[in-house]
Swiss-Prot record:
InterPro entries linked to this entry: Aminoacid_DH-like_N_sf (IPR046346), NAD(P)-bd_dom_sf (IPR036291), THF_DH/CycHdrlase (IPR000672), THF_DH/CycHdrlase_cat_dom (IPR020630), THF_DH/CycHdrlase_CS (IPR020867), THF_DH/CycHdrlase_NAD-bd_dom (IPR020631)
Pathway membership: One-carbon metabolism; tetrahydrofolate interconversion
Protein name in UniProt: Bifunctional protein FolD
Keywords: Amino-acid biosynthesis, Histidine biosynthesis, Hydrolase, Methionine biosynthesis, Multifunctional enzyme, NADP, One-carbon metabolism, Oxidoreductase, Purine biosynthesis
Protein encoded by which gene: folD
EC number: 1.5.1.5, 3.5.4.9
The organism of origin for this protein: Bradyrhizobium sp. (strain BTAi1 / ATCC BAA-1182)
Family: Belongs to the tetrahydrofolate dehydrogenase/cyclohydrolase family.
Function, as annotated: Catalyzes the oxidation of 5,10-methylenetetrahydrofolate to 5,10-methenyltetrahydrofolate and then the hydrolysis of 5,10-methenyltetrahydrofolate to 10-formyltetrahydrofolate.
Binding site for NADP(+): 166-168, 191, 232
GO MF annotation: an example: methenyltetrahydrofolate cyclohydrolase activity
Highest taxon listed in the record's lineage: Bacteria
Pfam families linked: THF_DHG_CYH, THF_DHG_CYH_C
Subunit structure: Homodimer.
CDD domains given in the database record: NAD_bind_m-THF_DH_Cyclohyd
Length: 294
């Protein structure tokens, strides 16, 4: 068996197209232009690349894009004042503070200062609480992308056995809640779980988000299972360079899985696309409009 490749690049492009069409519709029918504000603190090169990508894709979807760049030594009070200003700006429907923040800034305080209605990263405790209670909420973008990718293989996740390896607040925990809301049967595990291979071998859906290069092996996977690899790890090569791998030993797992996401080209492609989805949903909710068809 050779696994079907779940092409995140193609699926994300289709999702961005759906968002753009919905943005065009709400502009035409309601005079509403969704707006996303991204706050970048410091000059971390990787963060700058991510912010540029978000800006480009936001504009391509027909949304307004607002960038706010602050120095690494900015006072927390100044950052909080900017967030408060964005909270009250009617042209801004989504606020994203690029993480990680420089030392000296309290991430939890900063995230909690964002209006939950504009928290398009889905990290505010209000949204996390609603998600855990099965209520409508803005969900973190990476877990949301995992669900969308899964549904390209299984249009309904109801009744499927799923395992989430990883318990971070950014991916693992919210992914569990999203799966429960889809009526999947969910096991959450982590690097210290006992008999992890045996637990994983029972799952129809495997989500690897533990941050350990190629941890999930072939003999962990039930034949025909769907494997979603959230990991992004750089490992050295024999030539003294590095290469990007996930948390799944891709080549060997692809021989037994029914479907699998590659790294790169899988989950990572979905994150910004889902950010656009959340921004559109937030804009419609704030304006009192029905939930968009995406």
């Amino acid at each position: 068996m050779t696994a079907r490749i779940i092409d995140g690049k193609v699926i994300a492009a289709d999702l961005r197209g759906q968002v753009a069409r919905e943005v065009e519709r709400v502009k035409r029918d309601h005079g509403l232009t969704p707006g996303l504000a991204v706050v970048l603190v410091g000059n971390d090169p990787a963060s700058e690349v991510y912010v540029r990508s978000k800006h480009t894709q936001t504009q391509a979807a027909g949304m307004a894009s607002f960038e706010h760049k602050l120095p690494a030594d900015v006072a927390q009070s100044e950052l909080l004042a900017l967030i408060d200003k964005l909270n009250h700006d009617p042209s801004v429907h989504g606020i994203l503070v690029q993480l990680p923040l420089p030392k000296g800034l309290e991430t939890e305080i900063v995230i909690n200062a964002i209006d939950p209605a504009k928290d398009v990263d889905g990290l505010h405790p209000h949204n996390a609480g609603r998600l855990s209670g099965g209520q409508p909420a803005l969900a973190p973008c990476t877990p949301l992308g995992c669900i969308i990718l899964s549904k390209t293989v299984h249009p309904s996740l109801e009744g499927l056995n799923a395992i989430v390896i990883g318990r971070s607040n950014l991916v693992g925990r919210p992914l569990v809640q999203l799966l429960l809301n889809e009526n999947a049967t969910v096991t959450i595990a982590h690097s210290r779980s006992r008999d992890l291979a045996a637990l994983t071998a029972r799952a129809d859906l495997v989500y690897a988000a533990v941050g350990r290069p190629e941890m999930v092996k072939r003999d962990w996977i039930k034949p025909g299972a769907t494997v979603i690899d959230v990991g992004i790890n750089r490992i050295p090569t024999a030539e003294g360079k590095t290469r990007l791998v996930g948390d799944v030993a891709y080549a060997e797992v692809a021989e037994v899985a029914g479907a699998i996401t590659p790294v790169p080209g899988g989950v990572g492609q979905m994150t910004v696309a889902c950010l656009l989805v959340n921004t559109l949903r937030a804009a419609c909710a704030i304006a009192g409009l029905p939930k968009p068809a995406v």
